């Protein structure tokens, strides 16, 4: 390369060429040349070499000394020597070039911008000779200030090397019929794609790119830069780039963002870690296991999340959830407490963090009780279950007298036994000597798919707290039909009998705590464990959980003790069993007797008395005036009997002896029984069953919920009314059970409930109202995400350890997505009217958006007095919508709803033809085009049509690379097809047909195969494009990112598409080669056939001649 035809130059001793590649780049580094010029860098070197090889180089041609530059440009001295050698040649203009190299006038002249006169005049030689020295590079190859040494006379571009300038003029400004000229300037291009890319220089920003790929698809155009968007909200966010507006600020690091997607990514990522956890949940790295937690004080105006954060920060993580959950959520998801009501002070000392099993925690709170919503953190929708029951206890305890009882009862099926034992030890936590919750059973799903959560809450002293389970309708709450009044412990005898009936009824259904109960899982377990004193009633150990035995044994110590509390609990259980099945079989009675630890004869007699109506009188005993007993009107589906809290009711609500549930009434949260908010001082177990009931009797007497619980607090109600209410509640709870009969007063278990005006309960959420003596109601809302939700049975035993037995008779234990305990606490009954706002803890209301049709929040449904229903989805304090299953936060509720599909797998839009489902409607619309054959998008160059905008956009993003490849492939295919077809002409006529038919068949077959391959590949491309578009649309709709991220994604997609296209092209080429080989083989076979035919013909002729001779 260094030696031209002259061969007079000396080669450098050790030429350094390691910077040759960089030199070309450096030469034009400071020039304005665009990509088109850079495309020809390699051509420049080849042109230079060609120029050197010419014998006579015109003066205007590049001198040979230029060719040395690529080799020795890194060293100024070597360049100088080369120039000096060339000066000695005859073809050089003069011997004074070396002097001119150093002539400052020449250098000054060369620096001038208006050098149009230089080209193509001869003086350019001198100027060029001065160039290398003037523009010498230092050792590292950096260019000096002479970047504009040679300027193009047409476009004023500057070049250091004359070669580059000539090449630029040749390829950009010389016009001919084969070139493509720019209509706005004098540029010419060899390829249309170069011209199209060049046109972007005449437009602002990335307008051209968006125009090409939009194809009319992007309606919203930015007036500043011309960029277009498919969605208006994307344009709005884009305009913030021009305006500089950054409305989103990180509460932790104070960084601001213009795009909600960037803000959401920042918040959900682990990059920004501080004391303020996302979504009210502390980061795992921030959690500590301190023995005490800062006290939380909620004032009416104080924000709730900071308070929650304070409370949560010291909570250690719960035991890890079992591995088989549908979704593995962050560990800290388990704790999402929410402070529900303002104006309530609560100090919550936590022992070693959150719920140390069996540990007793006492906290002092204002007499109103702590208004704190604790979410039952069960993550996932399938077994095993991990439930934190300590929160439930905390809620109930706080509601009672401000003391917080925390009990760890995580019911994982895998470790049920150990956990239940912990629950047993923790269950006998006493608050002021009174146990609040003795145990909670595993959530179970009934055979019909209904789920119940039962929490039995019993206080020794009636004056402390009245717990009225309030029924939350899972779906639409029905008019309040069943009311339950909790009675003072004075009605223990009646209660004990009723407990027996309750137990019997529960036994008939499957008991969550013990498997003995064959009947409904929901009702039986609730009832059995309902026995506060007898909670230990060691029912036969459930196969799923064996730890209940130990707990049962501990709690069973008071089985038949004559003390009133155990009797009362037994009566409640028996009544529950009776409500389930008024006429149990012998086997059922045996199971009931085993569950309540009573002789079979006693249980049988009690049932007989109940059927004869002999026991109702006892149940009708008026409750002690001290304890308030709220009457909840109980209505059976067939025979609804509204009961006014103030009006006594007859004994037989069902037509059978009334059941008195007062002492340990089990109220299904999801079932029709809604405990009136009236508080019963007597220990009353809290039964939360979230089973769906056809009639949601979530409301207590109509007046009770709507009014500030004045009526519910009315304690003068006769016991008879209480019994009726209790019995109705029990029946409603168990009506779902297999053994439940239509005769039962309330069948609330499985049927979807109609919305009740009285009970403002959100769909699919059972609510339990725990009302402290101050008439502050505590609403426990158990949202149910799926139709089948597990039931939790919590048994409160007075001063005794309850027996927890989780009986998974169906073995269908499912995790409850969340259980939110919202407490609307009011200082006094009169103040209850504005129940404290219920803050959705885990986005339960968001979850309900998918399942419920009502946009009413839990608190709205819980409080009939409350203001008009609010949106289901609640905003966090920063105005964002937080996902309750992960750390993501969204700006819009619709984005959150779409995001929830990722957790639930829900695809609401289904194709009516192939039944394929999609998350977004527009995806279904594009999918339908596959069936209809519609292809509204067409490439303006190759005419190819697309049914999906994503496929079209990808095609356009590749700058017609598909079109070019398609044309090349078609040409190649045509050549291959025509090649073998010429052979038949040479063959004899009789063989032409034989030869042509197979070859034609081969070609036809190959063409058909090629078409099929093309169609298959096209379908695959469309499917891939559609999937990619879905991802893009999801990102655009949910989480729009910065422009840079979008570009990177597009580039990656382009690369992937190019790779796929290359693979397809190779595949087609291989197929074509294979086809050619097949044709060659056919031709050979035809030739051999011809040879054989000619041979046979000659042989026949010879034979004829022989015969003639």
From Swiss-Prot:
Ranges of compositional bias, category Basic and acidic residues: 483-501, 1097-1109
Keyword Phosphoprotein: yes
Cross-link (Glycyl lysine isopeptide (Lys-Gly) (interchain with G-Cter in SUMO2)): 166, 175, 287, 311, 315, 327, 419, 473, 484, 495, 528, 752
Keywords: Activator, DNA-binding, Homeobox, Isopeptide bond, Metal-binding, Nucleus, Phosphoprotein, Repeat, Repressor, Transcription, Transcription regulation, Ubl conjugation, Zinc, Zinc-finger
Linked residues for Glycyl lysine isopeptide (Lys-Gly) (interchain with G-Cter in SUMO): 327, 752
MF GO annotations: chromatin binding; DNA-binding transcription factor activity; DNA-binding transcription factor activity, RNA polymerase II-specific; DNA-binding transcription repressor activity, RNA polymerase II-specific; double-stranded DNA binding; E-box binding; RNA polymerase II cis-regulatory region sequence-specific DNA binding; sequence-specific DNA binding
Chain intervals for the UniProt region annotation (Disordered): 1-106, 123-143, 278-307, 468-501, 525-566, 614-711, 834-873, 968-1109
ZnF (C2H2-type) intervals: 150-173, 180-202, 220-242, 248-272, 881-903, 909-931, 937-958
GO BP annotations, alphabetical order: animal organ development; cartilage development; cell population proliferation; cellular response to amino acid stimulus; cellular response to transforming growth factor beta stimulus; central nervous system development; cochlea morphogenesis; embryonic camera-type eye morphogenesis
Compositional bias segments (type: Polar residues): 654-665, 673-703
Post-translational modification remark: Ubiquitinated, leading to degradation in a proteasome-dependent manner. Deubiquitinated by USP51, leading to stabilization.
Known partners and oligomeric status: Interacts (via N-terminus) with SMARCA4/BRG1.
Family according to the record: Belongs to the delta-EF1/ZFH-1 C2H2-type zinc-finger family.
Protein name per the record: Zinc finger E-box-binding homeobox 1
Biological source species: Rattus norvegicus
């Amino acid at each position: 390369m260094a030696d031209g035809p002259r061969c007079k130059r000396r080669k450098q001793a050790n030429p350094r060429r390691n910077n040759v590649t960089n030199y070309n780049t450096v030469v034009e580094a400071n020039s304005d040349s665009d990509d088109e010029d850079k495309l020809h860098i390699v051509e420049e070197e080849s042109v230079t070499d060609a120029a050197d090889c010419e014998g006579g180089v015109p003066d205007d041609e590049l001198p040979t000394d230029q060719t040395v530059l690529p080799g020795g440009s890194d060293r100024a001295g070597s360049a100088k020597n080369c120039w000096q050698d060339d000066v000695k040649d005859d073809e050089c203009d003069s011997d004074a070039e070396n002097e001119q190299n150093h002539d400052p006038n020449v250098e000054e002249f060369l620096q001038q911008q208006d050098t149009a006169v230089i080209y193509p005049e001869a003086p350019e030689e001198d100027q060029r000779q001065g160039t290398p020295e003037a523009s010498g590079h230092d050792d590292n190859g950096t260019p000096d200030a002479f970047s504009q040494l040679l300027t193009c006379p047409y476009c004023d571009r500057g070049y250091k090397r004359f070669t580059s300038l000539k090449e630029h003029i040749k390829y950009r400004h010389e016009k001919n019929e084969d070139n493509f000229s720019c209509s706005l300037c004098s540029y010419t291009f060899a390829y249309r794609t170069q011209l199209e890319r060049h046109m972007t220089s005449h437009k602002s920003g990335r307008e051209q790119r968006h125009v090409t790929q939009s194809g009319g698809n992007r309606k919203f155009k930015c007036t500043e830069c011309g960029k277009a968007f498919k969605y208006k909200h994307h344009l709005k966010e884009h305009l913030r780039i021009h305006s500089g507006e950054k409305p989103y600020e990180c509460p932790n690091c104070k960084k601001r963002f213009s795009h909600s997607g960037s803000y959401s990514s920042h918040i959900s990522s682990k990059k920004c870690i501080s004391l303020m956890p996302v979504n009210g949940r502390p980061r795992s790295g921030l959690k500590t296991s301190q023995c005490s937690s800062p006290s939380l004080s909620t004032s009416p105006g104080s924000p709730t999340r900071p308070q929650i954060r304070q409370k949560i920060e010291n909570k250690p993580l719960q035991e890890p959830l079992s591995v088989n959950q549908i979704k593995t959520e962050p560990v800290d998801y388990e704790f999402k407490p929410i402070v529900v009501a303002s104006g309530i002070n609560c100090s919550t000392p936590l022992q070693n963090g959150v719920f140390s099993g069996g540990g007793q925690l006492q906290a002092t709170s204002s007499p109103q009780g702590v208004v704190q919503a604790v979410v039952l953190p069960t993550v996932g929708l399938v077994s095993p279950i991990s439930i934190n029951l300590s929160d439930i206890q905390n809620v109930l305890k706080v509601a009672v007298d401000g003391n917080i009882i925390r009990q760890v009862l995580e019911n994982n099926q895998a470790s049920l036994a150990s956990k239940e034992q912990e629950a047993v030890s923790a269950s006998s936590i006493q608050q002021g000597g009174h146990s609040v919750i003795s145990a909670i059973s595993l959530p179970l799903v009934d055979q019909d798919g209904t789920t119940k959560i039962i929490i039995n809450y019993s206080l020794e002293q009636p004056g402390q707290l009245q717990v009225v389970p309030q029924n939350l309708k899972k779906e639409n709450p029905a008019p309040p039909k069943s009311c339950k009044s909790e009675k003072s412990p004075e009605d223990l005898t009646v209660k004990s009998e009723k407990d027996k009936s309750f137990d019997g009824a529960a036994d008939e259904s499957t008991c969550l705590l013990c498997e003995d109960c064959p009947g409904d899982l929901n009702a039986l377990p609730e009832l059995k464990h309902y026995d506060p004193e007898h909670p230990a009633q060691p029912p036969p150990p459930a196969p799923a959980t064996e730890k209940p035995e130990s707990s049962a044994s501990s709690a069973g110590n008071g089985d038949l003790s004559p003390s009133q509390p155990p009797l009362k609990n037994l009566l409640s259980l028996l009544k529950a069993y009776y409500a389930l099945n008024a006429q149990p079989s012998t086997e059922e009675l045996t199971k009931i007797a085993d569950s309540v630890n009573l002789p079979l004869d006693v249980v049988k007699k009690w049932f007989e008395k109940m059927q004869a109506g002999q026991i109702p009188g006892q149940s009708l005993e008026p409750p002690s005036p001290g304890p308030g007993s709220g009457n909840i009107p109980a209505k059976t589906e067939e025979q609804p009997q509204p009961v006014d809290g103030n009006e006594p009711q007859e004994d037989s609500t069902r037509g059978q002896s009334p059941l008195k549930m007062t002492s340990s009434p089990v109220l299904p949260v999801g079932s029709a029984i809604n405990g009136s908010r009236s508080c019963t001082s007597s220990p009353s177990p809290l039964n939360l069953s979230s089973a769906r009931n056809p009639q949601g009797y979530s409301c207590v007497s109509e007046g009770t919920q709507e009014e500030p619980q004045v009526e519910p607090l009315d304690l003068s109600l006769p016991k008879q009314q209480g019994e009726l209410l209790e019995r109705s509640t029990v029946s409603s709870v168990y009506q779902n059970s297999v053994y439940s009969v239509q005769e039962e007063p309330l069948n609330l278990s499985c049927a979807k409930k109609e919305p009740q005006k009285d009970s403002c309960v959100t769909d699919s959420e059972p609510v339990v109202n725990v009302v402290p003596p101050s008439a502050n109601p505590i609403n426990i809302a158990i949202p149910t995400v799926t139709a089948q939700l597990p039931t939790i049975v919590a048994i409160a035993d007075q001063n005794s350890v309850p027996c927890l037995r989780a009986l998974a008779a169906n073995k269908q234990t499912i995790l409850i997505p969340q259980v939110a305990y919202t407490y609307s606490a009011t200082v006094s009954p009169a103040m209850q009217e504005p129940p404290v706002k219920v803050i959705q803890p885990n986005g339960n209301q968001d979850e309900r958006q998918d399942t419920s049709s009502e946009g009413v929040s839990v608190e709205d449904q819980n409080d009939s007095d409350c203001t008009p229903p609010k949106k289901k989805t609640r905003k966090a304090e920063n105005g964002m919508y937080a996902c309750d299953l992960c750390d993501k936060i969204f700006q819009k509720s619709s984005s959150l709803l779409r995001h929830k599909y990722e957790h639930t797998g829900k695809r609401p839009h289904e194709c009516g033809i192939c039944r394929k489902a999609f998350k977004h409607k527009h995806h279904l619309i594009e999918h339908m085009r596959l069936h209809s054959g519609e292809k509204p998008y067409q490439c303006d160059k190759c005419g190819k049509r697309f049914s999906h905008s994503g496929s079209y956009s990808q095609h356009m993003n590749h700058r017609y690379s598909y079109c070019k490849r398609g044309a090349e492939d078609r040409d190649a295919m045509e050549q291959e097809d025509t090649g073998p077809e010429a052979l038949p002409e040479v063959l004899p006529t009789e063989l032409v047909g034989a030869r042509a038919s197979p070859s034609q068949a081969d070609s036809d077959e190959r063409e058909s195969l090629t078409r099929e391959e093309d169609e298959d590949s096209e379908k695959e491309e469309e499917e891939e494009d559609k999937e990619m578009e879905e991802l893009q649309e999801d990102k655009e709709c949910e989480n729009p990112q910065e422009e840079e991220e979008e570009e990177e994604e597009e580039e990656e997609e382009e690369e992937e598409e190019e790779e796929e296209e290359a693979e397809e092209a190779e595949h087609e080429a291989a197929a074509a080669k294979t086809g050619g080989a097949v044709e060659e083989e056919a031709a050979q076979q035809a030739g051999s056939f011809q040879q054989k035919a000619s041979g046979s013909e000659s042989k026949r002729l010879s034979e004829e001649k022989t015969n003639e001779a």
